[in-house]
From Swiss-Prot:
The gene is psaA. It catalyses: reduced [plastocyanin] + hnu + oxidized [2Fe-2S]-[ferredoxin] = oxidized [plastocyanin] + reduced [2Fe-2S]-[ferredoxin]. It comes from the Eukaryota. This is Photosystem I P700 chlorophyll a apoprotein A1. P700 is a chlorophyll a/chlorophyll a' dimer, A0 is one or more chlorophyll a, A1 is one or both phylloquinones and FX is a shared 4Fe-4S iron-sulfur center. The PsaA/B heterodimer binds the P700 chlorophyll special pair and subsequent electron acceptors. PSI consists of a core antenna complex that captures photons, and an electron transfer chain that converts photonic excitation into a charge separation. The eukaryotic PSI reaction center is composed of at least 11 subunits. It comes from Tupiella akineta (Green alga).
Length: 751
């Protein structure tokens, strides 16, 4: 930490906003493309509408003034938050108006969650399945019911109130977006004041946010959930305001409330251990994490982040300076180290966004893996359809964010990177030895690809030849994942040494006893074997190839041996001009395009592995004779051949979606069919040449001219880049919707 010289102390509070910078007017709304000289002239060819969509939000292309760009982005964020609040409000409104939440609350193990009722217009009411408790509706798999129970919501009135609150917040956000662009817009120096931003985001957003949630959990969620777990009728449970205002009510449930704040100020904190616990594992009644553990966790997180938000130097001459930290960060082999990175991160929002997307995407994938192993909400673990949906959803989101990180890193390299300010720092050194990085990464991909695929091919061949003893499997040649098993064992044993008062390890997946709720497995030890070893190497392969493509796109965004002046051609271009063959599809955009396909591959293998593994080895029913898993443990025997994946996973488990017609799951059958069609439609764009379509269009235009109905706007074939964009969008949409309908029809039918 450094202390500032006294002359910096005298800094007075500065005005960091401009008043009324942009007048509010709807004139521009009537003029599509007002932000571009070319587009505002209106359409002459059909390419205009594509360029309009491509450039509407490309603020860099509309102005070079960083302050104006920053204000537009800042204002757009408020608009985004407004839309999120409207969406959330809609979810809560559906819970209040169209759901069986109160019935589900009374019997969450037998009644399924539903918050949508289909109106009978032409027979769609077949979709309203019987979810139990005398309610007909569509089974939802978003996890909102479990979240609401964990929050302590017991009545539909509370859901209505929260829905209205969401709309009020949305209005506030839309107002803020308008106000901070038109009335009081921050100056560039406000956006670049990173120390203030860190302090406010760490202390305010994360610190006080966690503290507020911990307070809600302690005063509202814990008492209500304790009573619900004990079987008290939701209608007889005191309302939140009664619990907050009446300490004697709380003291009946948590005796330490009698003592008030005395133990806190006398540092006798262990008195509060009746509602701030460190038990570990899952609550056997609900199959979720102990809510007293999660309240304790949020309180601890709040303390950490409130402290963290006091670390950076602002108007008082104490604390860290981000620039000083980065400039001082040098190692013996890293040249100038982090010098120059501060300037990059305060002048390039693409660089900032790239880092945030990479972190946020990784975090989303981490959430996916924790929400099944450590289910945070009551009765989440036994709702298999919701578990599968949340896992799948958070993986897809993470994959898209990580590809987006590479996209914006490449845009930064092209639009914002200045080689003169980055001599011999880490970024420059990485770019200078990019050939070594990419060629080594390429070797790793080849190694992983041939070896992982080769193990499967070997097994398929031996299986076809009737030689099971020569296969890699748990019953023949074993390839046990010994490191993963060691990690499981150490995590199972660790709490005994590091947290002797904890009742269990962090998750039953490490080892120990089965946690069953209402005769269903919530979580249990997950045994790993040869089949997991094989598919984990496919995970490694697909992830490394995705990284290879994306990283190559970033490192070669400005120049390459093939096209030394690539930076001048921009982020997306079809080829390096006429007369230079073999230079097509090399733009940074094309790397993002290819990266999306490999991201789709990678995530697909992950969610397929999860879906089959859980059905085979975890999910199922518990009775006196033991555990009966949904697919009876067939993962270990079948998942070690490609044929096994095709026959015993894809084919065997698609019968529910294929045979869903005439049942309440029939929508999934239609989506399955339609999404296959959307996916196939994408191939028409991906496998075709632009000239083919231009020829066809000209012949059709000729026919229109003959009939004197020629259009005023001249039709044009999609450009190569546009065609590829339309192709990849439909490929991903079709693929994801196919997987979604396949998973849900299956798991709702058998789960």
């Amino acid at each position: 930490m450094t202390i500032s010289p006294p002359e910096r102390e005298a800094k007075k509070v500065k005005i960091v906003v401009d008043r009324d910078p942009v007048e509010t007017s709807f004139e521009k709304w009537a003029k599509p493309g007002h932000f571009s000289r070319t587009l505002s002239k209106g359409p002459t060819t059909t390419t205009w509408i594509w360029n309009l969509h491509a450039d509407a939000h490309d603020f860099d292309a509309q102005t070079t003034d960083l302050e104006e760009i920053s204000r537009k982005v800042f204002s757009a964020h408020f608009g985004q938050l407004g839309i999120i609040f409207i969406w959330l409000s809609g979810m809560y409104f559906h819970g209040a108006r169209f759901s069986n939440y109160e019935a589900w609350l009374s019997d969450p193990t037998h009644i399924k969650p539903s918050a949508q009722v289909v109106w009978p217009i032409v027979g769609q009411e077949i979709l309203n399945g019987d979810v139990g408790g005398g309610f007909q509706g569509i089974q939802i798999t978003s996890g909102f019911f479990q979240l609401w129970r964990a929050s302590g919501i017991t009545t539909e009135l509370q859901l209505y109130s929260t829905a209205i609150g969401g709309l009020v917040m949305a209005a506030a956000m839309f107002f803020a977006g308008w106000f901070h662009f038109h009335k009081s817009a921050p100056k560039l120096e406000w956006f670049q004041n990173v120390e203030s931003m860190l302090n406010h985001h760490l202390s305010g957003l994360l610190g006080l946010g966690s503290l507020a949630w911990a307070g809600h959990q302690i005063h509202v969620s814990l008492p209500i959930n304790k009573l619900l777990d004990a079987g008290v009728d939701p209608h007889e449970i005191p309302l939140p305001h009664e619990l907050i205002l009446n300490p004697s009510l709380m003291a009946q449930l948590y005796p330490s409330f009698k003592q008030g704040l005395a133990p806190f100020f006398t540092l006798n904190w262990s008195e509060y251990s009746d509602f701030l616990t460190f038990q570990g594992g899952l609550n056997p009644v609900t199959g979720g994490l102990w809510l007293t553990d999660t309240a304790h966790h949020h309180l601890a997180i709040a303390v950490l982040f409130i402290v963290a938000g006091h670390m950076y130097r602002t108007n008082w001459g104490i604390g860290h300076s981000m620039k000083e930290i980065l400039d001082a960060h040098k190692g013996p082999f890293t040249g100038e180290g982090h010098k120059g990175l501060y300037e990059i991160l305060t002048t390039s929002w693409h660089a900032q966004l790239a880092i945030n997307l990479a972190l946020f995407g990784s975090l989303s994938i981490i959430v996916a893996h924790h929400q099944y192993s450590m289910p945070p909400y009551p009765y989440l673990a036994t709702d298999y359809a919701t578990q599968l949906s949340l896992f799948t959803h958070h993986n897809w989101i993470g994959g898209f964010c990580i590809v987006g990180a590479a996209a914006h890193a490449a845009i930064f390299m092209i639009r914002d990177y200045d080689p003169t300010n980055n001599y011999n720092n880490l970024l420059d050194r990485v770019i200078r030895h990019r050939d070594a990085i990419i060629s080594h990464l390429n070797w790793v991909c080849i190694f992983l690809g041939f070896h992982s695929f080769g193990l499967y091919i070997h097994n398929d061949t031996m299986s076809a030849l009737g030689r099971p003893a020569d296969m890699f499997s748990d019953t023949a040649i074993q390839l046990q994942p010994v490191f993963a098993q060691w990690i499981q064992k150490t995590h199972f044993l660790a709490p005994g040494f590091t947290a002797p008062n904890a009742l269990a390890s962090t998750s039953p997946s490490w080892g120990g006893d089965v946690v069953a709720v209402g005769g269903k497995v919530a979580m249990m030890p997950i045994s790993l074997g040869t089949s997991d070893f094989l598919v984990h190497h496919v995970h490694a392969f697909t992830i490394h190839v995705t990284v290879l493509i994306l990283l190559k796109g970033v490192l070669y965004a400005r120049s390459s041996r093939l096209i030394p002046d690539k930076a001048n051609l921009g982020f997306r271009f079809p080829c390096d001009g006429p007369g230079r063959g073999g230079t097509c599809q090399v733009s940074a955009w094309d790397h993002v395009f290819l990266g999306l396909f490999w991201m789709y591959n990678a995530i697909s293998v992950v969610i397929f592995h999860f879906s089959w593994k859980m059905q085979s080895d975890v999910w199922g029913t518990v009775n006196a004779s033991g555990i009966s898993h949904i697919t009876g443990g067939n993962f270990a025997q079948s998942a070690n051949t490609i044929n096994g994946w095709l026959r015993d996973f894809l084919w065997a488990q698609s019968s529910q979606v294929i045979q869903s017609y005439g049942s309440s799951l029939s929508a999934y059958g239609l989506i399955f069919l339609g999404a296959h069609f959307v996916w196939a439609f994408s191939l028409m764009f991906l496998f075709s040449g632009r000239g083919y379509w231009q020829e066809l269009i000209e012949s059709i235009v000729w026919a229109h001219n003959k009939l004197k109905v020629a259009p005023a706007i001249q039709p044009r074939a999609l450009s190569i880049t546009q065609g590829r964009a339309v192709g990849v969008a439909h490929y991903l949409l079709g693929g994801i919707a196919t997987t979604w309908s396949f998973f849900l029809a299956r798991i709702i039918a058998v789960g």
